[in-house]
A protein has these predicted regions:
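Non-catalytic cap/lid and distal C-terminal segments of serine-dependent acyl enzymes
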Residues: 20-187
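Basic/polar N-terminal segments that are highly enriched at the extreme N-terminus
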Residues: 1, 18-21
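Hydrophobic h-region of N-terminal signal peptides that target proteins for export
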Residues: 10-19
Length: 187
């Protein structure tokens, strides 16, 4: 019995370690529009390195206020565990991208000084499409987000339906114009 439990524990730990290796944090991206570096995280499909021609759909996972891209893996949903389940069900063949959102609500600021949404659409997505083997069209691009990121997951496709085919806002945070103006800008 102990032998079976040890074998099971070893297999489970091996799978988790394998998925964690694929969750690559602090990838470099420099935005000319924002004049700053915005690190992101990425998870590639298990067979990504086995073939040089296969292209994959992309899911952008947008985090909540006060969080970072790594919080998808460390704090909230334990992404590596979710990925293992998705792959066991045959549903893991996506490129998952976790952008840095600061406290932007994935929108442009009212005064135009921090055009986050414009940067996301005009710089970040083309950067990802150029760096990775994505299927670079709207039918293969989606957003999922929680809290502030849920707002981003909703507003990005609403304002840019030519770019995204699917949106899953989770526990979405809403802000009125007045609330948005009162919040301190942090980036």
């Amino acid at each position: 019995m102990n032998k079976v439990l040890y074998t099971f524990a070893f297999c489970l730990l091996s799978l988790t370690a394998f998925a964690q290796e694929r969750f690559t944090s602090n990838q470099p991206f420099h935005s000319e529009m924002l004049g700053m570096d915005l690190p992101y995280a990425v998870v590639l499909p298990a067979d990504y390195d086995e073939t040089s021609e296969t292209r994959y759909p992309v899911i952008y996972l947008t985090h909540g206020i006060g969080c970072t891209p790594d919080d998808w893996n460390d704090k909230y949903i334990r992404f590596e565990e979710t990925l293992i389940q998705l792959e066991q069900e045959g549903l893991g063949d996506f490129i998952y991208v976790f952008p840095t959102g600061f406290s932007s609500y994935y929108s442009n600021t009212y005064d135009g000084k921090f055009p986050y949404m414009d940067m996301f659409i005009q710089e970040f997505i083309p950067f990802i499409d150029g760096k990775y083997r994505t299927i670079a069209d709207r039918d293969h691009r989606a957003t999922i987000g929680f809290s502030m990121g849920g707002f981003g997951a909703m507003v990005l496709p609403l304002k840019h339906p030519e770019t995204f085919c699917f949106s899953a806002p989770l526990s979405m945070s809403f802000r009125t114009d007045e609330m948005y103006l009162e919040e301190p800008l942090k980036w």
